[in-house]
């Protein structure tokens, strides 16, 4: 369905997709994946009620720009985008295994990169 194109869905693992696509954990604890009952799961880095948007979707980007334009036209002084570093996800193509939580945790984050800290 077109509305699903706005979010990050993946097929579950296991015979019938009963297992989440990866072992990723939510910032709030528990799995970062929520099942929808058809073998598919959606990603939420925070609460299940806050599904992550797919910023590769032209509709998501257009809606975001429309929202910014709406408020800019009303004279707001600026915008605060919470957790901006976590908006876009560079996921591998569907069918490619996702990295494990341990592999993700080993990556530099929060602006701490060995090259930049020299």
Language-model features and meaning:
Residues 1-118:
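Alpha-amylase-like alpha-glycosidases and glucanotransferases acting on alpha-linked glucans and related
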């Amino acid at each position: 369905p077109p509305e699903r194109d706005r979010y990050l869905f993946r097929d579950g693992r296991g015979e019938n997709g009963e297992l989440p696509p990866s072992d990723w954990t939510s910032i709030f604890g528990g799995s970062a994946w929520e099942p929808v009952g058809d073998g598919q799961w959606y990603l939420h880095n925070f609460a299940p009620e806050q599904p992550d948007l797919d910023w590769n979707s032209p509709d998501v980007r257009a809606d975001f720009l429309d929202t910014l334009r709406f408020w800019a036209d009303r004279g707001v002084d600026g915008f605060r985008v919470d957790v901006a570093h976590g908006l876009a996800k560079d996921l591998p193509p569907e069918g490619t295994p996702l990295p494990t939580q341990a592999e993700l945790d080993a990556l530099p984050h929060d602006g701490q990169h060995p090259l930049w800290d020299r």
